Amino acid sequence: LLNFGIRFANVHDVLGIMYTHKSPCSFVMDKRKSHTILVREFCDLVQAKRLEKDNPRQGITIINQVAKEVAAGKKYILFPEGGYRFNNKNKVCDFKAGSFKIALKSHAPIVPIALIDSYKVFNSFHIGPITTYVHYLKPICYEEYKGMKTQEIADLVKIRIEEKIQQEMQAHR
């Protein structure tokens, strides 16, 4: 099972997903950001993979390791946007197609996740309590995406997440 969330602003998005997820899971994170206070320990605790963004060879190794672990039953959270924008107002950035190589290699279902208002926690000028929402969308089974290129899979997942965010934003106006 691959959970594809969006807007990896910080480890708190991962915590929101892990808190609401029914099974233990891990995640892939930028190596530089993984060595901050408490984040390092959390990454070690859940055996997160640390990705060196400027090292393609290491990226391929991580993709292969995660694909093997997912095929064996481990669950991972991936953030295909590959970064974040300050105060993004729930806008979805373009997805990096390479993230979806893991799904193709492991034949795992892809579970799109729509995170709503998570950016407000640390990446906006909002003051006061914040309620964030985590929506797990219908899984995309391997049979549905097996003949697609990674960019086509990325586009499919992105569209489903954008539609859910738009639907929820209209419902809560």
Q: Which residues does each predicted region cover?
A:
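Polar-ligand-bearing catalytic/cofactor-coordination segments
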Residues: R50-K53, P139-Y142, L156
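A cross-family acyltransferase "interaction/gating" segment
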Residues: L38-R40, K74-I77, F86-E152
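Catalytic core of membrane glycerolipid acyltransferases/transacylases, capturing the structured
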Residues: L1-N55
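Membrane-interfacial terminal anchoring regions of lipid-handling membrane enzymes
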Residues: K68, Q151-R173
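Short glycine-rich anion-binding loops that position phosphate/pyrophosphate groups of nucleotides
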Residues: F8-N10, E81-R85
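A conditional alpha-helix N-cap/helix-loop micro-motif detector
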Residues: R7, P56-I60, V92, T150
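Anionic-ligand binding region
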Residues: I62-V66
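Residue-level preference for the first positions of well-ordered beta-strands
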Residues: L1-L2, K75-F79
